[in-house]
Amino acid sequence: LFKLPEDIQGTLRSQPAAFYAKRIISCEGATEEGIIRAISDHLQEERGYGLAVQGIVHIDGTGHNQFYKYANIFKSIGYDSLVFCDDDNRDVDKDKEDARNNGIEIVLCDKGKSIEQQLFNDIPWEGVCELLDYAIQEHGEQKIIESNGFGSVKEIKESTEESQTNWRTKLGDKAKSKQAWYKNIHHGEQLGKVIIKYVSQMDKECTLRKEYEQIINWIGNDID
């Protein structure tokens, strides 16, 4: 009987499907896991099967460095593993290096950026406006606009191309902050839908598009 490392047993109790998987996507947190769910749903609609048919399970790595630990442990017991995460925490650089050395593929934002900041930085302006509308719908205009001194929704949406760069930074920073605009799986799924909607319009060299394509390529089409 094979005994799993203690570190992983809690995850297997909360997410037993991981035990039966062939491949694991270790997500930094709920936002990233929601994005992966949206991608799986999109693939289900597009080709007729999602990640589960391929034996791929995504897990919430619960932040800090735990998602790297999970990926390393699963890799050590024979699971092909991918990490999907921010790159705004230098405290986990050693864990990231260990994962890479273990042959784990890592889908990473630009250095210093969270997924929220990457989204607002890379997505077409129409997508930025959709993300803003969704945040207001979920949290209210007072929290999203007024408490941050943003003026008005109209001012943001109708801003000039020159000022849009500044708004992208402000919105990304606030979305990432303790206000946590998108920090649950449901919100992450909505972010994923927006990414999928606009990915073909993004510059081919932008990080968010590369992240999406890296995930799609890793998933592949194998259902054996």
What are the residue ranges of the model-derived segments?
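Conserved beta-strand-loop-alpha-helix hinge in the C-terminal portion
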Residues: 1-4
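Acidic, Mg2+-coordinating catalytic modules of nucleic-acid enzymes
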Residues: 11-26, 30-224
